[in-house]
């Protein structure tokens, strides 16, 4: 084989200068799962095929959160929300977020709405285990989109340990005079006198 030629064809000329062994390393480095499965094997067996890609990635579709730059121009350029914000729901679809809480019991979880955020927290009581005391707790804050009324948010816990938080979108409001109906009051030809 001649020097500088690869044993396979490349569609992108910039890949010719890269080290072939480094390609798989860079894709794993940017992966949030660090090469691990998103769920244990027994949990993934019961999910339908269409739900697994949505639950295992941080962003719907093929984009991973580590591959898209986060900055003020990222929202305008890629349509990616800023850090700490949830993606806006599509028109007509409810807003929905899933949080994996499989290691917590329902009585150990708390969901509350405060200052435009849904706050999910969980806490295990301290347990005596081998060599010490173990305590687990977490808090996750999720910002509500502007299209969602905080009063309509509700949460449910699946048997697999997923906390599903959802809310319907607020229908768009129209100001008086913008709708298609006639703004004028009907004129009656009858006169009524009050005595």
Swiss-Prot record:
Q: PTM comment for this protein? A: Phosphorylated.
Instruction: Show the disulfide pairing.
Output: none
Keywords recorded for this protein, A-Z = Chaperone, Cytoplasm, Methylation, Nucleus, Phosphoprotein, Stress response
UniProt cross-references to SUPFAM superfamilies, sorted A to Z: HSP20-like chaperones
Among Gene3D superfamilies, the record links this protein to: 2.60.40.790
GO molecular function ontology, one term from the record: protein homodimerization activity
Report residue spans for region: Disordered: 175-195
Q: Where is the signal peptide?
A: none
Location of Phosphoserine modifications: 56
Instruction: List locations, semicolon-separated.
Output: Cytoplasm; Nucleus
Residues bearing PTM Phosphothreonine? 62
Q: Biased composition, Polar residues: where in the chain?
A: 176-195
Write out the GO cellular component annotations. cytoplasm; nucleus; protein folding chaperone complex
Primary location class? cytoplasm
An example GO biological process term is: cellular response to unfolded protein
Where in the numbering of this chain does the sHSP domain appear? 73-184
Where are residues bearing Asymmetric dimethylarginine located in the sequence?
70, 77
Q: Which PANTHER family match?
A: HEAT SHOCK PROTEIN BETA-8
How does this chain assemble?
Monomer. Forms a ternary complex with BAG3 and HSPA1A. Component of the chaperone-assisted selective autophagy (CASA) complex consisting of BAG3, HSPA8/HSC70, HSPB8 and STUB1/CHIP. Interacts with HSPB1. Interacts with DNAJB6. Interacts with BAG3.
UniProt record similarity statement: Belongs to the small heat shock protein (HSP20) family.
Q: What does this protein do?
A: Involved in the chaperone-assisted selective autophagy (CASA), a crucial process for protein quality control, particularly in mechanical strained cells and tissues such as muscle. Displays temperature-dependent chaperone activity.
Query: What's the protein called, per UniProt?
Result: Heat shock protein beta-8
| Name of the gene this protein is made from | HSPB8
């Amino acid at each position: 084989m001649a020097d500088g030629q690869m044993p396979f064809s490349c569609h992108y000329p910039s890949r010719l200068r890269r080290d072939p062994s480094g390609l798989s390393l860079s894709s794993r480095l940017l992966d949030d799962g660090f090469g691990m499965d998103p769920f244990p094997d027994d949990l993934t067996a019961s999910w339908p095929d269409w739900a697994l890609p949505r639950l295992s990635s941080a962003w719907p579709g093929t984009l991973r959160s580590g591959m898209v730059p986060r900055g003020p121009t990222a929202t305008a350029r890629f349509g990616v929300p800023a850090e700490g914000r949830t993606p806006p729901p599509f028109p007509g679809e409810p807003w929905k977020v899933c949080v994996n809480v499989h290691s917590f019991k329902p009585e150990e979880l708390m969901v509350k709405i405060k200052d435009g955020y849904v706050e999910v927290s969980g806490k295990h009581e301290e347990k005596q285990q081998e060599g010490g005391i173990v305590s687990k707790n977490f808090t996750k804050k999720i910002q509500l989109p502007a299209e969602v009324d905080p009063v309509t948010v509700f949460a449910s816990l699946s048997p697999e340990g997923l906390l599903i938080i959802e809310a319907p979108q607020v229908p768009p409001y129209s100001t008086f005079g913008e709708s298609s109906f006639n703004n004028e009051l009907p004129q009656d030809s009858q006169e009524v006198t009050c005595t």
